[in-house]
Amino acid sequence: MAQREQDILRVDARDKVTGRTKYAADLVFDGILYTKSVHADLPHGKLLAVHTAAALAAEGVAGVYTARDIPGRNVGDNEKPIMVYDTIRSRGDCIAVVAAVSQEAADRAARLVTYDTQPMPAVFDPEEALLPDAPKLYDDGNLILEHRVRKGWAAKGFDEADIIVEREFRTQRVIPGAIEPESVVVSPQDGELRVYCPCKAPFNIRRIVAAACGLPMSAVRVTQPGMGGSFGGKDDDAGAMAARAAIAALHTGRPCRMTWRSSETLLEGVKRHPFHIYYKAGAKRDGTLTAIEVRGFVDGGAYLSKSKTTTWRSGIEATGPYRVEHVDVCMKAAYTNNCYAGSVRGFGSPQIDFATESVMDELAQQLGMTPWAFREKNLLRDGDISGSGQPMRDVSAGACLERLRREFGEDLRPFVRNGKLVGRGIACLYRGESYGAGTPVQDTSGVTIVLNADGSLNVSTGLSEVGQGGHTLLTAIIGRELGLPPERIHIAPADTDYCVDSGSTAASRGTITAGNAAWLAAQEAKQQINTALWEYRGFDGPIVYEDGLVRCGDEQMTFTEAVGVLRNTGRDMRAHGWWAAPKTFWDREKCRGSNYMSYAYGACGAEVEIDPITGKADVTDFVAVHDMGRIINHAATVGQVGGGVSMGVGYALTENADTPGGVTRAADLDSYLLPTALDMCPVRTVLLEEGAGVPPLLVHGIGEPATSIVAPAITNAMSAALGARIDTLPADLETVRAILDEKKR
């Protein structure tokens, strides 16, 4: 087992707590204009005309722009348009953008923009959207992706089963819910567009803005200001906002800002995909799983964002961390006239894990086994073949479950405490890491180190610091390899003019991709210095970097002196690390493959207390066990788990951004019930270093695993307490109250 690394103070902590960090909404520019989107008020229809004269005549207005004012491309096929040209596909689509001297003036003028439409039939359910007579959002139909996974023969497996459980599950939309509002500033400067945008993928923003403005990418520079969280947001939304502000900036020649209120986020912003899942599983009397069959429908909303990768992932993970010989999974994603859905924390895992772990509990119950015993019997082990056909290695699911049993306690029987129903539930994690074979891009990341004459380092990477502590992680990795304290290492914000494209801070890939690239960059820096010392200073043998010193046997010098030797050789003072993920593949004909380069494993336990009168559910205890491979920063990892649990609690119990009839249920954060600190119980986090992670650092990601199985652990506890299965999220007051009332009849 690897030695646990020390806790590391975040490199941005002081600036954030003292208010020195500048977020996009804090940036000040002379002559700045404020922009406001005009939103459609129907879910589907033809846009016949937009009337802007009254808005243009309003006080303080500098311009009003429609899709006809976009000089370049209005994004890609089936992607969310910057502004609607001729067809409205979702309530909240952008019809026009107003630019004015103040936000108040922009808001007033936006209300003066009117438009003519011809309503069209709409569809709001993904299963209905795939029927032959459903209203079509696009000429080629409503199907986004059909993903099938097959192993063995499901019918044979069900014939072998003594017990079969069939259940139907539904999950809801939720928002990413970052504390910082979406905001962007675009400023024409020195013949280029400067874009100040908190985002997950700055190079994607550059691509979108350049295409919209008809400019080469070299004429658009995206710089990331301080960022207050993402959780799957600040991606597609950031691109649309940046493009709208850029179009206004191009036309006016002035800096333009766009900042969303929470009502705009709820109306137009990206949400988690709702799933409708039919799940069937069979087992023998001794508890052996024999077959799993899943049919799932994924609501992608009106536009293409991350629906393909979400649907693909959910199909791969549908069998959970369990050994089963016969599998038949079919997941279909469809366009609907709802708001579009994207890569909200976990994208696909939380939805399918809710179904899988619920059915595993029910199978155990019908077989008279404990949830522990049933899972232990069926957990994957090294050498097994997963449900999607991948040979498994470094499987630590069993170690995680056993540690959870020790920490949480073995007794899962429901009981009554102070007049309240108390249930205890568990869930197991099996999550593919990073992009996987379902994403048609090679997963890569780069980090560059510049060695300065005073022995300090400038580090750059295109992978965004979204608030998770990524820069602290890179500082720790480089500092440990070169023997330097954090104050000698400066990591610049992502800047497309000076960093290499390293993909998106998504899919829990930051630690794996940028972390490994940073380690490789540090090795190259050491090799350059070592070569100089061997050739020019007579060092002979291994060289050690520690505490700001460079040692070789009895020889010793400061790191600064060693850098000076390198400088005097005339060699490059830069080191670059480039990391590429191991190849994955998917056989579309056989419906199986080597799907992800590695898998994250974990197990969670939840205790839930339910008031039998009101139906209110409170999580009173939560234990999260995760295998990290190797822990780089213990404190940051514990923090990620705590945040992930809080997001999972909201997903399980309160949050709901569903859109009945295309109208978002919650209009603002007063009616969208995010959990607060008062709604959270203490989270007991246990971090293991069992299974080997991704080399060379041997690490696993944690951002999304921390959330993925929280909801099923909670709902399994609630189902035990209520004596009835929770099959719909959120398990809110109304849901619980209905179960309690039904049991009284």
Question: Where are the regions a protein language model picked out?
Answer:
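Helix-loop-helix junctions that connect adjacent transmembrane helices in secondary transporters/permeases
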Residues: D133-C213, L379-S456, E589, R665-D679, ...
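Glycine-rich loop/linker segments at domain edges
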Residues: Q6, D12-T18, L143-V184, P274-V359, ...
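Thiamine diphosphate
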Residues: R207, S230-G253, R257-T259, G470-I478
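C-terminal catalytic domains of large/alpha subunits in multi-subunit enzymes
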Residues: A67-R68, G214-A219, A249-C256, R285, ...
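Short, aliphatic-rich beta-strand segments
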Residues: T35, L193-C197, S456-T461, V619-D621
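Short acidic, glycine/serine/threonine-rich loops at helix termini
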Residues: N74-N78, A109-L112, R206-I208, F231-D237, ...
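Flexible, low-hydrophobicity surface segments
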Residues: M1-E146, I164-R167, H251
